[in-house]
Amino acid sequence: MTPKTDVRGEPFRLASRTRRVRAALLCVSLLLLLVPARAQDNNTMNTLAERYVRLVLAVGQHDADYVDAYYGPAEWRTEAEAQKLPLTEIASRTSALAQAIGAAKPPVTADQMTQLRYEYLARQLDAVRARVSMLTGTKLRFDEESKALYDAVAPTHTEADFAKVLAKLETMLPGRGALVDRYDEFRRSFIIPKDRLDPVFKAAIDACRSRTLRHIMLPPGESFIVEYVTGKSWSGYNWYQGNYRSLIQVNTDLPIYVDRAIDLACHEGYPGHHVYNVLLEKNLLRDRGWIEFSVYPLFSPQSLIAEGTANYGIEVAFPRAERLEFERRVLFPAAQLKSEMAARYYQVLDLVEQLSYAGNEAARRYINGEIDAKGAADWLEKYGMYSRPRAEQRVRFIDQYRSYVINYNLGKDLVAGYIESQGTDRWGAFARLISSPRLPSALTVDARR
C-alpha cells in the first residue's frame, strides 16, 4: 500500500517548518530582552535596599533599641557610628529613598517574590520614617503609632468585653480576696525551682527542636545558647547574631512557671525567632542576595510577623493534647512538680489567655494619656490577671516599647488566620510565611483569597 502524502507537497512542509523556526527565534529574542531587564530591575532594588540598610543603621545611632540584629558588612556599621547623621539628615534621606522606591515599582508581570520584596521594602521604609519622626518629637496616639510602625491596628476592648471570662475564673478559683490574688496563689504550685530551670529549659528546647526539624530543613551549624539574666523589662529575648546563631536570654527577675518552658523554647527558639531569622538569612540574604534582610529594625512591620509567628508557632509545634502529655511526662517531673494538676492548670490558663487584649488596652490608655503608670498597672491586675510585680514590669515594657505590645496577640491572631486559610498543612504554610517578605496588612487580604 502506498502511504498517504500531503497533497500540498514538500514546499508546504518547508514553509511550515520555516514558520516554526521563526517563531522559536522570536521567543528566544524576547527572552533575551527580558533577562537584562530583570537583571536591571534586581540591581536597582539591590541599590535601594543598601540605602535602606544604611538608614536603619543611622537611626540606630539615636535609638539603642532600634537595630535588633545586623549581620551585613561590618564597614557599614562602622561608617554609621563614625558619621552619626543628624535625625534631620536621616529624615531627608528617607524621603528621597521613598521617592526612588516609588519610581522602581516592578511591572505586574513580575513574579510574586519580586512583588513581595518591593512592597516589603516600601512599607519597612515607611516605618523608618515614622520612627525618625517620633525621635524628633512627634507624638502619636496608640493606634496611629501601631499603624505607622507595624502596619496594623489592634481592636479596642472595654471592661465589659472581659467580664464573662473574669466571671468564669471566679467560678474556677473560688475563695476570698481579689481574684488576681487567688490566681497568683493557684499558680505558685507551678513555679519551676531555680535550680531546675536549666534542665527544664533544655528538655523543652530539645523537644521543640526535634519537632521543628521534622518539618523544616535548617542549614548545618544553626544553633543558639541560653543565658539567664536579671534586670530586664521582658521575660525572654532572642538576639540573632547572624551566621545561623542566636543568643537567647531568659529573665529570672520573677518566678518562672512550668508552662513558660515550652512557650519560651518555641517562641525564642524553634520554630520561633531563631528559625525565622535563620530562614530569612538563608533564603533571602544568602540565596537571593537581598541585603535588606541583613538588618532587623525592631520598630517595623517585620516585628508583627516575627512575634505573631513565634507565638503561633507554639501551637504548631505543640498542639494542646500533645503539649499536655509531654509536660505531664517530661517537664513536670523535671521541675519536680505534681503532674496530676496539669489539666486543671491549663483550663485556668486557657481562660486567662482570653484576657490577653487587656494588656493592649492598658498600653493604649497609658500612651494616650488617659491613665498614668499606676493606673496601667491597676488595669493589668484587674483585667489581665497580672500580679502587682508583673504588672509593674509590664508597664516598664510599655514605657520602653510602647505599641509594640500588639505584635504578640494581634500578630498571633493574624498569623493564625492566614495559615489556617492555606489548607491543612500548617507546617508547610508556616515555613513559607517565615521564609518570605510578607506584610501584616497582606495577611488578612491573602487569607480571604
What do these predicted ranges mean?
Residues 24-33:
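Bacterial N-terminal signal peptides
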